[in-house]
């Protein structure tokens, strides 16, 4: 082969027919690699550490393994036989720096099989079209961080904290509208800069308007909203807040047979979802990076660089008890 590296082995394929002018020759290549440097066990953890130069990739884990680490944002999918797979498109230059980690405590056999996908649409209506100004806002500059901590699915509840920077002079409150189908409880807030605790109160949109608290936005009078007042922001200053709440949302977070289902649009660029203890991810419609927390829970990071909301559909199964 011209320009070939003499120290490298190649597979040479003879095509069944000549490639026509302006045409293509399609080839399916099936091969098995053995490479201890890129695919190995690190204690009880399976590691696949292999940069991938192909633009579209899918990696299927062995039966019985759950995904606990993935460095490239990927869809998490389930094969028909219950094996976990990741799939991603790599649009950047060079190779995708993929490192997968997995541990052997996933279900096997009939218990591992996925539920059949339905024709049901998302319970949430699509978001209204964004304005040109919103679409051209620099999303990498947005510094909101939201972490969802899923409780056991039988409760339909999840807690979250939301870090937010207020920069608008004259604003003296934050409003968090409670979505239809959700109930908010245990709201709290404090100033990250000073540690000062803030009062959080749930009220209607009409009550918020009557309170004269300036949150910088208008809320439907009938909506339920958690309002957090604070000292008005002065010109040239900012205020960094951490807001925490617990939501109960039977429509978006539930147990479907033996599967956990979290179905919720996330509108901010940076979101994370932490599975409850004892569960492993089996499906994630939105690409996510995956990591394992010190306490054994799985965390999925959704960094959404697109102007529309991330339509997260996340599924999980219980780990095998050891």
Roles of regions detected by a PLM:
Residues 1-322:
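Lumenal/extracellular ectodomains and adaptor appendage modules
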